[in-house]
A protein has these predicted regions:
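Active-site-adjacent structural elements that line small-molecule/cofactor binding pockets in enzymes
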Residues: 1-290
Length: 290
């Protein structure tokens, strides 16, 4: 976290998991909210948050309370990513209920309503299919009036929920053409509920590798695949999957293409936490040009 701040990055996000994923439960996985509290204490400038907090893991009132508390402790630097949950094996391992996808989307819709209502500081009565509140209020609220609420996804129902609730839509795992298509769909969903599409920021999340040249970038892919074997094997396959990777000039070209299509910010997944050299190269050779 301190390296990210010192290098000039704007944000640092954490995933929300109960165990190591992708077939490696033996790997360390710090609990989300305590680690964000520590991050708040160890940094001064960067914004941060979960990407994303799964609604299947916690009641939305608890999410609202923890998010508001961390926002207070950090002086208003929290962005909240909220999602429907996705890792079925993780839920099964710990006996956490994992409803079908349509139900999880309904839970996400209700959870976003509950969280924003609790943040208002006013008494809230809410009767949904999954959550019920009666004159509920919780103080203190967030330090910032309306923390950024980030939602991801590309599905038809998901994009309607994004249009209804989110202040930022996160696109992932796809190319420029797919982003344009889904961004237009989101615009249409906003128009259907009389919301200005410009109110919703567009961001992109993707795995990334970078090297001084493409051979060095390929070496980093090889290292990442030793941790996550499902990742693409070659730099060409990496880029075809919509991932960001290559030499600094190649990464700049990829990011500029997405920026021209409407991406406002990039969330680059850094799988090797000990690899500060890649972050330094990204900060010095890429960020000044995008």
């Amino acid at each position: 976290a301190e390296a990210v701040e010192d290098l000039g990055f704007s944000h640092l996000f954490r995933s929300d998991h109960l165990t190591g994923i992708y077939g490696h439960p033996e790997r360390a996985s710090l609990a989300l909210w305590p680690s964000l509290t520590a991050l708040a204490m160890r940094t001064k400038r960067i914004r941060f948050g979960p990407m994303v907090c799964a609604v299947t893991f916690r009641h939305p009132v608890m999410v609202a309370k923890m998010a508001a508390s961390v926002d207070q402790l950090s002086g208003g630097r929290l962005d909240l990513g909220l999602g429907a949950g996705w890792n079925d094996m993780e839920h099964k391992m710990f006996g956490v209920n994992y409803p079908r996808y349509g139900v999880r989307l309904e839970m996400l819709d209700e959870a976003a309503t509950v969280i924003k209502s609790i943040w208002s500081g006013e008494p809230v009565t809410f009767t949904g299919n999954y959550y019920q509140l009666e004159e509920a209020q919780s103080h203190p609220g967030p330090a910032q009036p309306n923390p950024t609420l980030i939602m991801g996804g590309k599905g038809e129902k998901t994009l309607k929920i994004v249009a209804k609730h989110a202040t930022e839509w996160n696109f992932s795992y796809g190319g420029v053409d797919l982003f344009r298509e889904k961004s237009r769909e989101l615009d249409q969903n906003c128009a259907a509920i009389n919301r200005d599409p410009g109110d919703i920021r567009r961001s992109m999340m993707a795995p990334f590798v970078i090297g001084r040249d493409e051979a060095a970038a390929q070496s980093r892919i090889d290292a990442h695949r030793r941790m996550f074997s499902s990742l693409p094997a070659t730099l060409a396959e990496w880029n075809e999957a919509g991932f960001i990777g290559g030499s600094p000039s190649r990464v700049i070209d990829q990011m500029k293409a997405f920026t021209a299509a409407g991406i406002d910010r990039f969330m680059l997944q850094h799988n090797d936490l000990d690899d500060i050299d890649s972050l330094t190269l990204l900060a010095t050779e890429v960020l000044p040009h995008v």
